């Protein structure tokens, strides 16, 4: 009986059940974060970095409005002011040049908030007074236009960022086009054309002075003394008849044999052009000779 009373007086000690420790969501500066932040969480000492990402207080204010998809013409001043001040309060190490602008905007927001909370006088209660947010909205709209224009300009392709200029060295290549040579068949065809035109001139049979091939060679070189190409047909005078045409043709052949003429043709059956090469001879007067004449003649190059 006594033993039962002793057991009732001193009940056995129960071992406490261990509770599972709550797992933190994150660790910030060694401190666990157990609850999900209700708003954008900014860790300590981070405002300096965050504010550097904004171009000024208007940029920060516009960011808060855009983040919540708010109407810029109907800003909830109380909520925006609270969020804006939260950004300012987390700064521990002040940077006065940077903080001054943001503190001024915080004061402006606080003033607008207080003006909207104050009751209006009865005499203007039913009248449409000026919205305390009007000036701030105007500044935000103007800043938003400039910011959008800057973003559009930044999106344009930029040299050395989006593309690079290509540089290539192109050597100065002057192509010398050498016309193809003319064969005897082409010359005879051209001669036939000249003879046909010479037949158109008819006259009385009179005795003429003998035509000299050597003299005609000199006449041809004189005609071509400018060193340019001339049409083959311009060397002939149809009024001289067939005899004059043949003498001129023989003179051309003699000059070509002496390498004093350059005869070219662009295409088969195309026009023939002739250029004098006598300008390259600087060794005094040329001694022109022909198998069709008895004695040589002298021609001074231009």
Swiss-Prot record:
Keyword terms, alphabetized: Cell cycle, Cell division, Chromosome partition, Cytoplasm
This protein's record includes keyword Transmembrane helix: no
Record field: transmembrane: none
This protein's record includes keyword Thylakoid: no
Single biological process term from Gene Ontology: cell division
Location of the protein in the cell: Cytoplasm
GO-annotated cellular components: cytoplasm
Short name of one Pfam family: SMC_ScpA
Location (main, coarse): cytoplasm
Family from the record: Belongs to the ScpA family.
Record function comment: Participates in chromosomal partition during cell division. May act via the formation of a condensin-like complex containing Smc and ScpB that pull DNA away from mid-cell into both cell halves.
Self-association and partners: Component of a cohesin-like complex composed of ScpA, ScpB and the Smc homodimer, in which ScpA and ScpB bind to the head domain of Smc. The presence of the three proteins is required for the association of the complex with DNA.
Protein name: Segregation and condensation protein A
Source organism per UniProt: Xylella fastidiosa (strain 9a5c)
Lineage: Bacteria, Pseudomonadati, Pseudomonadota, Gammaproteobacteria, Lysobacterales
